[in-house]
Amino acid sequence: MDVAAMARCVGRCYVSPAFGESESHRLSERRFLKLSSSTNSDPAGSKSLKLRGKIHRRMSYFRPIMAKDESISSRSGETKQINGKQKNIVWHDCPVTKSDRQELIKQKGCVIWITGLSGSGKSSLACALSRALHNRGKLSYILDGDNVRHGLNSDLSFEADDRAENIRRVGEVAKLFADSGIICIASLISPYRIERAACRALLPQGDFIEVFMDVPLHVCEARDPKGLYKRARAGKIKGFTGVDDPYEAPLDCEIVIQNSRDKGLSSSSSSSSSPSSSSSSLCEMADIVVSYLDQNGYLKKHSTKSRNCM
């Protein structure tokens, strides 16, 4: 039987447990497969999948949830257009709502989007903020710009189109976290206003909280914790934000954290009346954001745990 015939016969299959192993032990290793219907005999042009150390040609991963030939109920009963093309995909409602999930964990889901130049302290603030929320009994998760490229976005380059897709994917995943009731902390350079605005538009009004790390370029370059500015100045990295690619600072974000050699750290919020801070401590930085969340009703119930954010 040729590959095309096999593809017609086999709709879906999964990697079964190895001989002698229990179903539950290998459950996490299941992968749905799809056989390619291509008849191209060129091995170099075919896709392959490695299973238990062996290469299987003309097989590729695919998403198991597909609406083709399925009748799925939706709120509108209409199919959805994706990228301008009609798809047999409709929304399926669930009786457990976002409000139900938020009531269960006693907090409101939202996205805290930390933006700024490389070396401005985005990841450090994200970790300190996550610890501060954890100490208050609040559930959060960090989507770090570097970390997501190890998995979710490992197929993307740093070309313009792929950088835009990187932001789009993180925005969509952050939206899902917020919908689950989790406080999602996304820390990415995200240099362009239009891309940050697109992510904001994914969420209900007020659930996208933009935090701008307003740190001067010369300060970030002096820190250069990853050596990226040095490589960019030497011409080894092209299109590096702040060197040969622009960073568009937010014009109307919720929180601004500024850092200068003379004044240390200060903060301002466009939507709250919290006083500014003059400490450069990570805990103080995290408290600026926590105070905003508290004042705007995202933290429904306080914890008596320590305020230590590290």
Swiss-Prot record:
Pathway: Sulfur metabolism; hydrogen sulfide biosynthesis; sulfite from sulfate: step 2/3. It catalyses: adenosine 5'-phosphosulfate + ATP = 3'-phosphoadenylyl sulfate + ADP + H(+). Its EC number is 2.7.1.25. The keyword Plastid applies. One of its GO terms (cellular component) is plastid. The record marks F158 as: Participates in a stacking interaction with the adenine ring of adenylyl-sulfate. This is Adenylyl-sulfate kinase 4, chloroplastic. It comes from Arabidopsis thaliana. The lineage of its organism: Eukaryota, Viridiplantae, Streptophyta, Embryophyta, Tracheophyta.
